[in-house]
């Protein structure tokens, strides 16, 4: 039993050491790329805001990324234009409701 514990301890130490070396190996280009992704995430379009010009730029909600939902609007002049907003699709709303209900029941 003692041998098993020693082997497990050695494996855990080796794995943690290997993962820390991987973090140190990140190059400057990769760090800049990660920072750019973070900046893009901050510039996403919030829920209920217009996304007509950037249909893939909606932010993330609690569980899912918001989807750009479009409708055709007819102006008083009779022109049809497409208007889009970031929102939660009905099937995502249902999933969030079930998860929220499950969290209330099971803690």
UniProtKB/Swiss-Prot annotation:
The keyword Electron transport does not apply. Its main location: secreted. It is found in: Secreted. Keywords: Disulfide bond, Knottin, Secreted, Signal, Toxin. One of its GO terms (molecular function) is toxin activity. Disulfide bonds join 44-59, 51-68, 58-86, 70-84. GO terms for cellular component: extracellular region. Belongs to the neurotoxin 19 (CSTX) family. 04 (U1-Lctx) subfamily. This is U1-lycotoxin-Ls1b. It comes from Lycosa singoriensis.
